Amino acid sequence: MEIADKIISYLKETYQPDAIIVYGSFSDGSANKNSDFDALVIASHSKEHDSSVIDGTILDVFIYPVDTFLSEYDPEEFVQVWDGTIILDKNRIAEHLQKRVLEYIERTPQKTDDEILQELDWCEKMVSRTLREDTEGYYRWHWVLFDSLEIYCDIKHLHYYGPKKALRQM
């Protein structure tokens, strides 16, 4: 049995879920020995985070009560599942969640040219502050490096889905 199958079995036994959406590297086929296992579990269970280790793989699994998706919720909170793999979906909750997230992404306005220019000005200002070569300068270097991926996506008029996907788009 492969590790993903063992993890899915663990999730089913532990949470008796209505739905499971796997996202990230185990969903897109880029998992390696250092990958964690990202998933959203919808179950008659309290909201929690499961960071158990199964056969050396760390879980990054978010469990949400079914009620979360039966009332109004912010789809931005769940944007990571937009292209995830639905493993289990007893009542089409996962299907509706993905659809709602995709609609949210499509409705998200792109940044204007002025907003992008402001972001680029901010980058230049931050890079100039890194020249101090002190603790604050090193912090600002990290900050601009982190934010530059999202700014790159803004420039290219792409939705930012996180660092791994942004790096692949480059």
Regions found by a protein language model. Give the residues of each.
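Conserved NTP/Mg2+-binding pocket subregion across the NTase superfamily
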Residues: 50-135
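Metal-dependent nucleotidyltransferase catalytic core
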Residues: 1-34, 40-87
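Conserved nucleotidyltransferase catalytic core and NTase-mimicking acidic/glycine-rich helix/loop elements
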Residues: 111-170
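Context-gated lysine
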Residues: 6, 12, 33, 47, ...
